[in-house]
Regions:
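Basic, Lys/Arg-enriched alpha-helical interface segments
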Residues: 1-90, 100-104, 111-136
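Short beta-strand motif preference
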Residues: 93-97
Length: 136
């Protein structure tokens, strides 16, 4: 069965049938980085500690895709925090919280070996951030 699609159209032609496709609208996101009450940026500190510049580039490229609206391989890890997987050895992760559908707050990063403690730290950061925002 031959299937073809024309760019910019929302229909696929499957032999003699026309099938309508419901495309999801991609929503660009504003990325912000969490700053602790004492002025530290945990994500920037982690990123600058990486010795592999290729890893830094891969992580920044992954965040660029998030800016364009593509969360890709990500999942909730609970308490409002999500994990964004970066497809690069040794299994880098970026942890974030999200406000609505357009604002992403980058909390911290890590890799597979430190995943459990990174998730705990990200949850602490998210909780502190929400409390600080609600107090204002």
């Amino acid at each position: 069965m031959a299937v073809s699609a024309a760019l910019g159209e929302d229909r696929l032609y499957d032999d003699q049938r026309v099938v309508a496709i419901d495309f999801m609208e991609v929503q660009p996101r504003d990325i912000r980085r969490y700053i602790t009450p004492d002025g530290r940026n945990p994500f920037a500190e982690w990123l600058s500690s990486l010795r592999d510049l290729n890893a830094v580039v891969k992580i920044e490229q992954r965040l660029d895709r998030v800016r364009l609206g593509n969360l890709g391989n990500s999942k909730s890890v609970g308490e409002g925090v999500c994990e964004l997987k970066v497809d690069f050895w040794p299994g880098y992760r970026v942890y974030f919280g999200q406000f609505g559908s357009t604002i992403v707050l980058i909390l911290c990063g890590g890799d597979k070996s430190s995943q459990e403690q990174d998730i705990r730290k990200a949850k602490e950061y998210w909780k502190e951030y929400e409390e600080r925002e609600n107090a204002n």
